[in-house]
């Protein structure tokens, strides 16, 4: 026998609660009924979903209570034991996710976010399936009233497909990014954009506290495998990117913490009055006109922060950009006195 842990936890599995209800209802005719004036809450486990294999996901339920009692939420896999334990990613049946203590939050990540952020999708008792299979989950909503609690239960079916794994392929090292420069992100679509998943759009999120909180960088962008998103232009010591399917429950996180350094765009842009850049979009040449004749340097960065062109600004203010490919760039102009301004530059060939 393989014990998940050496001690028990002080709660009942939803399957045990269901068995209790069955017995109580069966004995209802010969029992004495006493009201505890506690109304039954409601539980909604949400829709059934199809997700890619080898990919983390999150379940969020909804519970309401007519008495406005505080609720706890218990997400559990319901598949009967028919596989090797501890579970393995290749199991096509049986449980792969352990039961954990009920939470006041209606959300549970599979596996837990601490494992996801450690780049481990197969911890011993929360193993992400690497093969196509079905996963049955139960949501038990409990009002935990000490004078006689009430609970409600709902179920959802998660179908793991042969598509996947869906994963973030950028930000794979602990480096620092300029917050004033759009961040280039990439991910492996892995067949999630076609049937049976048909995920056409994804959401991009940023966390700076290891998944405790998230902020939206892009609400809905095409699921094409690459995009440029704007970062908060401030200093961030430990940032991670999450890319999550729109209208689905699966997601992926980049593999390493990275830093964000506040860039100059937001803080000194107003120092250079009268600057003019044209044409923008440009083809082979860009013209820079300053408010006064002054020595200046220019730097052009691509959206990954790589310097692709630089030099001293000529007297006529012309910059040759014929070697740059079509796309978006950041043009940085720095005067001799240290003042600096960044502007978005578009190249259209």
List each model region and its residues.
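Extracellular (secreted or membrane-anchored) zinc-dependent metallopeptidases
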Residues: 1-138, 147-152
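Residue-level detector of functionally pivotal "anchor" positions at catalytic/ligand-binding pockets or at interdomain
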Residues: 30-37, 257-278, 284
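Short, solvent-exposed loop/linker segments at the N-terminal edge
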Residues: 45, 49-57, 174-181, 277-282
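Extracellular acidic, Ser/Thr/Pro-rich low-complexity tracts
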Residues: 51, 62-67, 143, 188-195, ...
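A short beta-strand segment in extracellular, disulfide-stabilized domains
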Residues: 53-63, 182-186, 285-289
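Short, solvent-exposed loop/turn segments at the edges of extracellular beta-sandwich modules
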Residues: 142-149, 246-250
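Conserved Ser/Thr-centered positions that define the repeating blades of beta-propeller domains
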Residues: 205-209
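C-terminal outer-membrane/trafficking sorting elements
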Residues: 268-278, 282-349
